[in-house]
Amino acid sequence: FFKQKTAYEIASCLVGSDGHRELLTHVQGTVDGITAAKGRVCGVAARGTRSAEVYSFSAGGEKRLTCLNENYFATHDAAPVETWRFMRGGTELEAFALLPEGFDPARHYPAVVQIHGGPKLAYGPVFHHEMQVMRAQGYFVLFCNPRGSDGRGNAFMDVRGRYGQEDYEDIMAFLDDALARWPQIDRARVGVCGGSYGGFMVNWIIGHTERFACAVSQRSISNMVSMFCTSDIGYRFIADQCGATPWDDMDALWEQSPLAYAHRAKTPTLFIHGAEDYRCDRSEAMQMFTALRYHGVESRLCLFEGENHELSRSGTPSQRIRRLNEILAWLAHYLKPEPGKKQGVNKI
């Protein structure tokens, strides 16, 4: 099984002991797992505006074997993802957007920029529940694959020792391109959200620009020194990703820490963290939250008891609903025409 060009232009194949490859499928979407047994190849895949189902793959194409979510999609709309490419510094970058429900070219709309984790992950034109909820509530939802993302080769993916540099600039250039493409986006009502590495980037962004009206930082990293010493990912990860340890180059770690720039932040920020997150310890959120409060920036910290780094994906259902409601309420307060109006998740 291999990926070609991007993580969402999937080519999957069987490789024989003689090196012969048999192409099974090459379509836009995701394949989260693939297995071969008794002459069949099956996997969990997502296609278009539908969530993941079980598929079988063969040289003749693919066949969906399950219809687990048809009742949901019979009563809930999901919009297709707009896709395009743009250039920055001679590098082609992938860009995506969901247009707000009932989009009217004569109106202006708020927007939310979403930043994926990893950074060795990738977005694509597939169903994403949280983004569809935001779209249904009247937002442009903008997302891209900056340098550091998966699917484009090792050179593109390698931002080690340079977190917050090319990746940050790519995201800012992406937003500029999206604003030029859709003048219906109200530049004064753009928010930014991200989790894990995406949370790191949100923390970094608020210390480097004031162009966002609000921010949501989830399961984030704020201090590479404390991250080195507390994360269950192991100390070798930060040493590799940042190119330093606390003992051979403390300055290098601090320079790549959003906390170092928190005194510059002006953006109202919501922090969401699992209380039992051992990948990015809850102290990462607490440090950034405390720094913003100390410097007089409006902020809110939500710690979810019993939840870990996987809150948004496999957390307790009631907690996942609460998380999404917290995000939507924060965005609505700062981005909607009626400040403070609570927004729920009952539409999708």
Identify what each model region corresponds to.
Residues F1-H20:
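Single conserved hydrophobic/aromatic residue that forms the stacking wall/gate
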Residues S17, C42-T49, S58:
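Beta-strand C-termini and the immediately following turn/loop, strongest in propeller blades
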